[in-house]
């Protein structure tokens, strides 16, 4: 019989991998999971990267944002691009989550107590998402003088939950 915490440990690395692969779909479709406008020039030390990895206007995005910014000679439903290039946060998340999957994969045999690996997954996922939110477009909420997004709140809960799970294990 496999206990629930062991099952969570088994699933943690796979969940990080799935999240990273899923964000590739967000990048490809331009589903609105993008960052704030990025009008900064690409730093010289990143000059070897394709431009879309620094800022991207998501042509043919499925949200059809900026309807007056139609792509010339485009036929079909998804013929719009963002007026201003934005940070491609879904791409950034994909890269980071795939790297975090490799970290979790390396750690999978290091802990004997059930639940520790999943607790680490929760902490890493929460930290990753919190920092990506700093450059992502999302609705901000205000409570007791504190401004936050829904994802930032979920990130905080993930980190606290992960710490709690590791402490419990």
Residue ranges of each PLM-predicted region?
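A feature for loop-to-transmembrane-helix boundaries and adjacent hydrophobic helices
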Residues: 1-169
């Amino acid at each position: 019989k496999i206990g629930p915490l062991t099952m969570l440990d088994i699933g943690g690395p796979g969940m990080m991998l799935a999240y990273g692969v899923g964000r590739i779909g967000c990048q490809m479709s331009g589903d609105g999971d993008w960052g704030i406008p990025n009008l900064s020039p690409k730093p010289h030390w990143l000059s070897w990267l394709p431009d879309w990895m620094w800022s991207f206007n998501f042509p043919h995005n499925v949200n059809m944002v900026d309807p007056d910014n139609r792509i010339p000679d485009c036929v079909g439903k998804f013929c719009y691009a963002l007026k201003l290039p934005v940070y491609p946060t879904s791409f950034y998340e994909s890269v980071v989550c795939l790297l975090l999957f490799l970290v979790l994969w390396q750690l999978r045999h290091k802990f004997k107590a059930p639940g520790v690996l999943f607790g680490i997954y929760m902490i890493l996922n929460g930290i990753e998402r919190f920092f990506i939110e700093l450059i992502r477009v999302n609705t901000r909420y205000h409570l007791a003088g504190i401004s936050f997004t829904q994802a930032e709140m979920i990130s905080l809960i993930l980190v606290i939950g992960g710490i709690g799970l590791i402490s419990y294990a």
